[in-house]
């Protein structure tokens, strides 16, 4: 009936920690690039493979949408990496809960993250014409978390008449 704690599972833990680490790395790269325009990140392999260019683009904040809808000063106009950190933390915490609502929230948040990943992948390839190793890896992590979320849907017992 109620919600109880459980282990999130090794795979969910690994995916969430990897996603969190990549999101924190993206924040670091963006901050370093803001301080020094000549900063070259480890993920900057060439002119068409540059994560720092992607993170510093207008689509690197609020998915490129928040500023135009809510304004540049909106609290939601944050680096996409901030949303990533929040998402991976929520996924890990919800993965520790056993209950119907936790499962529903896991699935819904996973679907939103995959939709966001598809949108950002489209921007990455067809607008920025770039290849971001960190971005592609987070998209794969999001897809993996979505698959895990669908596997973890609890079977509810049906009362026999």
UniProtKB/Swiss-Prot annotation:
SS bond partners: 43-51, 132-135
Chain sites annotated for binding phylloquinone: 135, 139
Keyword Ligase: no
Keywords: Disulfide bond, Endoplasmic reticulum, Membrane, Oxidoreductase, Quinone, Redox-active center, Transmembrane, Transmembrane helix
Catalyzed chemical reaction(s): phylloquinone + [protein]-disulfide + H2O = 2,3-epoxyphylloquinone + [protein]-dithiol; phylloquinol + [protein]-disulfide = phylloquinone + [protein]-dithiol
GO cellular component terms, semicolon-separated: endoplasmic reticulum lumen; endoplasmic reticulum membrane
Alphabetized InterPro entries for the sequence: VKOR, VKOR_sf, VKORC1/VKORC1L1
Pfam families: VKOR (PF07884)
Membrane topology field: Multi-pass membrane protein
Tissues expressed in: Highly expressed in liver. Detected at lower levels in lung, kidney and testis.
UniProt-reported outcome of changing residue 135 to S: Loss of enzyme activity
Its EC number(s): 1.17.4.4
Regulation of activity: Inhibited by warfarin (coumadin). Warfarin locks VKORC1 in both redox states into the closed conformation.
GO biological process: blood coagulation; bone development; peptidyl-glutamic acid carboxylation; positive regulation of coagulation; regulation of blood coagulation; vitamin K metabolic process; xenobiotic metabolic process
GO molecular function annotations of the record: quinone binding; vitamin-K-epoxide reductase (warfarin-insensitive) activity; vitamin-K-epoxide reductase (warfarin-sensitive) activity
Keyword Transmembrane helix among record annotations: yes
Transmembrane residue ranges: 10-29, 81-95, 101-128, 132-153
Residues in compartment: Cytoplasmic: 1-9, 96-100, 154-161
Primary localisation category: endoplasmic reticulum
Subcellular location: Endoplasmic reticulum membrane
Function summary: Involved in vitamin K metabolism. Catalytic subunit of the vitamin K epoxide reductase (VKOR) complex which reduces inactive vitamin K 2,3-epoxide to active vitamin K. Vitamin K is required for the gamma-carboxylation of various proteins, including clotting factors, and is required for normal blood coagulation, but also for normal bone development.
Record remark: domains: Partially oxidized VKORC1 forms a cysteine adduct with substrates, vitamin K 2,3-epoxide, inducing a closed conformation, juxtaposing all cysteines (S-S or SH) for unimpeded electron transfer. VKOR becomes fully oxidized with an open conformation that releases reaction products, vitamin K quinone, or hydroquinone. Cys-132 and Cys-135 constitute the catalytic redox-active center. Cys-43 and Cys-51 are the cysteine pair that mediates transfer of reducing equivalents during catalysis.
Family according to the record: Belongs to the VKOR family.
Identification of the protein by name: Vitamin K epoxide reductase complex subunit 1
Organism expressing this protein natively: Rattus norvegicus (Rat)
């Amino acid at each position: 009936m109620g919600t109880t704690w459980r282990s999130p599972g090794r795979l969910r833990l690994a995916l969430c920690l990897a996603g969190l680490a990549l999101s924190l790395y993206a924040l670091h790269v963006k901050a370093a690039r803001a301080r020094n325009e000549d900063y070259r990140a480890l993920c900057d392999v060439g002119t068409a493979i540059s994560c720092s260019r992607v993170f510093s683009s207008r689509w690197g904040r609020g998915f490129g949408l928040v500023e135009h809808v809510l304004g540049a000063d909106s609290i939601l106009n944050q680096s996409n990496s901030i949303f990533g950190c929040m998402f991976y933390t929520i996924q890990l915490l919800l993965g520790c809960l056993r209950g119907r609502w936790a499962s529903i929230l896991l699935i819904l948040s996973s679907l939103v993250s995959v939709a966001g990943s598809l949108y950002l992948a489209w921007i990455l390839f067809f607008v920025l014409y770039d290849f971001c190793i960190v971005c592609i890896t987070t998209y794969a992590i999001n897809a993996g978390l979505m698959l895990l979320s669908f596997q973890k849907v609890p079977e509810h017992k049906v009362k026999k008449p």
